Amino acid sequence: MPQAQIRKTQRNPKLWIAALVAASIVTISYKVYSSYIAEENIEDKKTEGDGGVEEKLRIAKRYTKKSIALTLSHSVLSSQLPLNEILLNSENVTFILPPNLSMDDLVCNIGNADEVERYNLPKTLLNNYKLLHCSNIDGYFNILKNLKPDTLLVCSEDLGIANNVPRDLHRFVKEIINIDQNKDDIYKKLSSIFIK
């Protein structure tokens, strides 16, 4: 390249402006990208560091794509499970309140929240059709037949249905997991599904 042509390119303001704009775009893109990655790392560290219930309350891989019906019997409500978090953080789970329990029983057993949250939780679940209440045992079985869950978690001793299960229920519910009234059995079976 001749000297005259080099001098013209050095004096050309359009070329300098284009180079400045390109450098600015690259710098801004890098800063945005690095801040985005930093935010993700901070969020990951928070969830790892918390070790809290939100991180632990995920449905086990075996049950992620299955619909689950959990009967909130007296034994389940009195267990040591974090029911408040399970009720709010479970997406494909429907909770059934059997005929022998009322909303007040549910409210009394989902503790560790202030009064306002405790009384709003069942209403929120009812409004989202995650909590169904039946008035008798026949209604309970009709709910199950209409829901057709893949898995049913029930303490049949609490409901008094150990010997009264309809024969055709297995046509509507693929897997029935019967839970004993023992708190350890309840915690073991339910935590294997709801707590990672």
Swiss-Prot record:
One of its GO terms (cellular component) is peroxisomal membrane. Keywords: Membrane, Peroxisome, Peroxisome biogenesis, Transmembrane, Transmembrane helix. One of its GO terms (biological process) is peroxisome organization. It is a single-pass membrane protein. It is found in: Peroxisome membrane. The chain crosses the membrane at residues 15-37. It holds the Pfam family Peroxin-22. Belongs to the peroxin-22 family. Involved in peroxisome biogenesis. This is Peroxisome assembly protein 22. It comes from Debaryomyces hansenii (strain ATCC 36239 / CBS 767 / BCRC 21394 / JCM 1990 / NBRC 0083 / IGC 2968). The gene is PEX22.
